[in-house]
Amino acid sequence: MSERILITNDDGIDTPGIRWLAKAVLRAGHDVVVAAPMTEASGSSASMTAIEEDGKIVVEPRELAGARNVPAYGVAASPAFIVLLALREAFGEAPAVVLSGINRGANAGAAVIHSGTVGATLTAAHAGLRGLAVSLDVLTPVQGSVASGGAAIDQLDETDEKRHWGSAAGLAVKLLPVLAHTPVGTILNLNVPDLHVDGIRGLRRASLARFGQVQVSIAERSEGFVRTAVQAAQENLEPGTDLAALAEGYASVTPLRSPSENRDVRLNLESIRVQTPAL
């Protein structure tokens, strides 16, 4: 019997990316359970947040179109918290692998710090599991620059079903055997161009770009409020990075790991006096 795979995301249980991913993984013969936030949780990183009613976290059974045989749950919690709940067998047998996505929008470069999609896999890796974060590059920097982040999300809502989710789902399934041969605690971050699979030039291992696709600026501020805007990053693409690979029509794969001690930093702590000198 194959190992159980948890599929989650940060866009919410009702978005198409998670349905496409669940269908593809199920068809590949894997044991799958889906648990994802009830509502949008983008930018939640690895936060441990939940909405409780009388001390209880709400969990609702859901049915995924095209994957009705997959047990699925909408959960009033962040993606990372959902992973934690799954590890405690809240949704049946604990998973051995966590897939997160398919995110609507690339999680490339510095953006991985804020991503709830990646945050879920970081939580899994910290617990000794392997994880795969999957994102589809559906929002170009130009699109992200035309309005605020909220308006950009509204635009995505209108065009969700027209995206090439199948391309990302298929590549994710093909990466699972590769992931299985990595050390425990490994995360693979997959970013896929929004193209038919025949239009994708291939897979490239890539480093993280020093910046994300878009940057937030202050569009307006006054008494009691600020208004932000999303702008295309003004940096030049560096060869060998994930953003450069996407721009050239490649899907990028970047191995990540959960936070750990930086042994290269030397600290002189002996010179610091902790106790207050006696007067």
Protein language model regions, located:
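Glycine/threonine-rich flexible loop motifs
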Residues: A106-S115
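Electrostatically charged, flexible surface regions
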Residues: G149-L279
